[in-house]
């Protein structure tokens, strides 16, 4: 008895009007993740994954390219409005927000969610070059 041919199911993308862009800007890299309101990741990109290596990875331009790639990855969800959460002191903070705005998203809110210790762990010792 022959089996019926297995048809590939077409993956249906849910339509999301509002999203949240989480930007993690460290001194070494920038990670951009776009989620829905519940926090389910829809797409992400990093400066390192965008082809930048070494010291070029920690530049504002690398963060801008990562934001553009992340925006391209979530276009099919139909996101129009973005709330932006920025975390970290890195050089890609501002350029990432500008790139998301230029990609066609309407930015409704920008929030700084950088964790600040209430005198927690001892910081690493200063560099001596």
Curated annotation (Swiss-Prot):
InterPro entries: Ribosomal_uS11, Ribosomal_uS11_bac-type, Ribosomal_uS11_CS, Ribosomal_uS11_sf. One of its GO terms (molecular function) is rRNA binding. GO terms for biological process: translation. The keyword RNA-binding applies. GO terms for cellular component: ribonucleoprotein complex; ribosome. Keywords: Ribonucleoprotein, Ribosomal protein, RNA-binding, rRNA-binding. It comes from the Bacteria. Belongs to the universal ribosomal protein uS11 family. Located on the platform of the 30S subunit, it bridges several disparate RNA helices of the 16S rRNA. Forms part of the Shine-Dalgarno cleft in the 70S ribosome. PANTHER family: 40S RIBOSOMAL PROTEIN S14/30S RIBOSOMAL PROTEIN S11. Part of the 30S ribosomal subunit. Interacts with proteins S7 and S18. Binds to IF-3. This is Small ribosomal subunit protein uS11.
